[in-house]
Amino acid sequence: LMFALARQLPEADASTQAGKWEKNRFMGVELTAKTLGLIGAGNIGSIVAARAIGLKMKVVAYDPFLSPERALELGVDKVELDELLARADFITLHTPLTDQTRGILGREALAQAKRGVRIVNCARGGLIDEAALKEALDSGHVAGAALDVFSEEPAKDNDLFGTPGLICTPHLGASTTEAQVNVAIQIAEQMSDFLLLGGIANAVNVPSLTAEETREELVSLRGPELTGQQQAKPYIGPRPAIVTPFTVRLR
């Protein structure tokens, strides 16, 4: 999406297929030597940083959890959000949607951004104030935006639609044949690890645990039961079942 945004590819494609030849209309910009601002430098953000550095872009990152050592390893400058906004020619978002990140690019932040900035959001809808983004696009302060996610999905009716300089896609982030195959394999491996070994990975309601950690956790949960058995008088008859709720949902 960043390439498409930089070179106005969707507009150029539509124009050419309409029988026009507007070569001079679609003047793009190069990525080389531009500054990319990452909001979020976790797994995906770090991969984007590596790709951008390969394009000879300068990369700055805002992420409260990014250590100076990790920033040095990634080859990025760790900065505060206001500095990122002032320096970035392109901004990409790579953060979950939380109370702290909702509307992180709002009206005030967009006003602080460098004039002519281009914004890409393939992370989560709600990170950008869409009404404020439309105003910034209409005024020309933001030169372009490419969105794969929206505050409400499916986004069948959005005030942003039709705004010049805007590229929209229907949340295609993981929509490749290879990604779907890899997800299926990963889920099968995770279920196998849990059922055969006890390891838990990528659950949404419990921390990831190794097989050994899972065994230790279960021993801890059963501790009161075992203690009660040792102190109780002998009892002849059916043993009451003790059930520990333990539901694992996989991403």
Task: Label the predicted regions.
Residues 41-42:
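Glycine-rich Rossmann-fold phosphate-binding loop(s) that bind the pyrophosphate
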